[in-house]
Amino acid sequence: MLRGPAAVWAALGPLLWACGLALRGGMLYPRESPSRERKELNGLWSFRADFSENRRQGFEQQWYRTPLRESGPTLDMPVPSSFNDVGQDRQLRSFVGWVWYEREATLPQRWTQDLGTRVVLRIGSAHYYAIVWVNGVHVAEHEGGHLPFEADISKLVQSGPLASCRITIAINNTLTPHTLPPGTILYQTDTSKYPKGYFVQNINFDFFNYAGLHRPVLLYTTPTTYIDDITISTSVNQDTGLVDYQIFVEGGEHFQLEVRLLDEEGKVVAQGTGGRGQLQVPNAHLWWPYLMHEHPAYLYSLEVRLTAQTAAGSVSDFYTLPVGIRTVAVTEHQFLINGKPFYFHGVNKHEDADIRGKGFDWPLLVKDFNLLRWLGANAFRTSHYPYAEEVMQLCDRYGIVVIDESPGVGIVLVESYSNVSLQHHLEVMEELVRRDKNHPAVVMWSVANEPASFLKPAGYYFKTLIAHTKALDPSRPVTFVTNSNYEADLGAPYVDVICVNSYYSWYHDYGHMEVIQLQLATQFENWYRTYQKPIIQSEYGADTIAGFHQDPPLMFSEEYQKGLLEQYHLVLDQKRKEYVVGELIWNFADFMTNQSPQRVMGNKKGIFTRQRQPKGAAFLLRERYWKLANETRYPWSAVKSQCLENSPFTL
């Protein structure tokens, strides 16, 4: 049975959700349709970093007014990618400040001459603060490095004879106590040790602060009266799937809406009209997680057709949205998907790879998903920021469950709990929910990772932040990931699921694996006794250098990583029979961090190397995850790996 607050949110949810999201406008993923076109702007862009002492030469000289090459030497920079690792310039790799991107785009004639066409520039991710100009005219600004933003540039490209447009984007990767993630700038004033004006960026998170245009940049079109946003929520009544929809239209008041829901064979299973309604699907195929059902990840297609009357005549807009029918609920000791107990056995990840940095890359993405399925993982957390939209789409298609996390990592300073920080964090959650609300794979929001939640302002901060997120989306539980003491954590009372990180026999009691079982069991018992909420072991692991071997195991050897995991698993197997509902290894793959004596070319806690090659622990974890899958499958039947036919153990 749902707890009291959950029941309240369930009752108020549809009204609050619609109101919250209606305030901001939509962020539908740009899909081609009979009424919509898109033009990718990925490839080589002109690039220049502003190395001036105050980092503002580009603004003082107005580099955006003329082609960037006229301002001085430029580099070719691939988009999407981080700029840090592409070149051979040591200064550029660690650069902090403004960098400038530019691209000329040739537009189809119909885009520039048809005043009934709306032309939109969409930037998937620009880390961290971005200012955008088109043909020297300011069109957009955006704070935050992990979520998309757009600008309607129709008037600029339809106002003259030009069939092209010059897009200039200035990006600043500086982090302050009020950004997400936060950081500080340290100025070194001792001129006997440092040059005049020398400064460094300090951060309180353990991954490299890659920067640039990390995700696709594109142009797309819609009619001037268009489908701006769609919000769906799903439920199940016996064998009937219920799809509640709300459609938001911009650019006109006189229109009709037709809605059809198609199954995977293209058959219409339900239809409706109007901007709000409910579709009933008899004998619905539910969206199930990978390995939980013999037919996981079933997706319907919601086809929306808008017909509007304008001064120029009748116009139409079409948009198709993938829909998975499923429910999520939390009890005192279970996490339920479609009313059945779900156990998270998965990983934490990073968007990180050689050369690309955090740049989106299709081959890498497909490789990662093949490894997840080989591993038998059914879930991951987007540690520690929202991932690319294309990642979320593959999770929907493959049935990989997602804990969708905001970039609220490293919130450890009192200044980062200010009203300024809180307001920005609230806006980030609005953007995240607006983007990912319709993904069936997303089953829980995480508003932060390892904040200093014992600080006095943390209670009000997380109470407000979690309540706001629930108002935006009451259909999903909300959490944050903690490493604070259970007695001191001021944010834990407001979460639906306790997510706790611990590194026994790694960051303390070095090498003493014999204490893991006692310490881990005590951790679980303390948290559950205090809050009576389900618990996920959201991080655990050990750094391992691939090829290092030592028996008896020593730290950094492959044997130590495996031995540490085995000690955790003994306790997890006991507690998952009670109230532990998941385990997520840290980390899926090795990743880059800042340089320090504690890091050897990055964090090495991956069960795969940064090049996606398995360490010994990957095989250990694979055996465990496939056995867990067989124990938790519904309806029960033995499953076999889709990625490896011959296996040394029973799958």
From Swiss-Prot:
Glycosylation, residue list: N172, N419, N630
Biological process terms in GO annotation: carbohydrate metabolic process
Q: Which cysteines are joined by disulfide bonds?
A: none
Activity regulation (record text)? Inhibited by L-aspartic acid.
Q: What domain of life is recorded for the organism?
A: Eukaryota
Record-linked PROSITE patterns? GLYCOSYL_HYDROL_F2_1, GLYCOSYL_HYDROL_F2_2
Signal peptide region: 1-22
| Keyword Hydrolase annotated | yes
Q: Where, per UniProt, does this protein localize? A: Lysosome
Q: Which UniProt keywords apply?
A: Disease variant, Glycoprotein, Glycosidase, Hydrolase, Lysosome, Signal
The protein's matches in SUPFAM superfamilies, at most eight in alphabetical order, are given as: (Trans)glycosidases (SSF51445), beta-Galactosidase/glucuronidase domain (SSF49303), Galactose-binding domain-like (SSF49785)
What subunit structure does UniProt give?
Homotetramer.
Described by its record, this protein's role is as follows: Plays an important role in the degradation of dermatan and keratan sulfates.
The family annotation for this protein states:
Belongs to the glycosyl hydrolase 2 family.
Implicated in which disease? Answer: Defects in GUSB are the cause of mucopolysaccharidosis type VII (MPS VII), an inherited disease reported in humans, mice, cats, and dogs.
* UniProt-listed NCBIfam families: PRK10150.1
UniProt-recorded name of the protein = Beta-glucuronidase
- This protein's species is Felis catus (Cat)
- Annotated gene: GUSB
